[in-house]
């Protein structure tokens, strides 16, 4: 099975360690839960950086693409 590989980009530090998720929906949920309260949300974005084939062990690169930005999930004042 082929699973997408994601990485969080911190604009001040760079890309973080990659993680494998089932699909974009799972990745977006995890990203939104972890980055909705963060300071400086404009610094963080979720990127798809490739795929992992669990049958062959191959990592398949792709042109990195932004899936979402933390600013999309910032909670308003309550």
Task: Locate predicted features.
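A short, exposed loop/beta-hairpin motif centered on an aromatic-Gly-Thr core
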Residues: 14-23
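Charged, amphipathic alpha-helical segments
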Residues: 23-33
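A generic alpha-helix propensity feature with a strong bias for hydrophobic helices
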Residues: 7, 21, 64-67
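Short, mixed-charge low-complexity intrinsically disordered segments
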Residues: 34-78
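Short aromatic-glycine-(Arg/Gly/Cys) micro-motifs in beta-strand/loop hairpins
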Residues: 1-15
């Amino acid at each position: 099975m082929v699973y997408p590989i994601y990485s969080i980009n911190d604009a001040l530090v760079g890309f973080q360690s990659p993680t494998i998720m089932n699909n974009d929906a799972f990745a977006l949920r995890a990203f939104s839960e972890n980055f909705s309260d963060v300071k400086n949300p404009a610094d963080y974005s979720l990127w798809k950086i490739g795929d992992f084939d669990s049958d062959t062990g191959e990592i398949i690169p792709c042109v990195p693409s932004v899936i979402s930005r933390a600013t999309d999930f910032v909670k308003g004042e309550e």
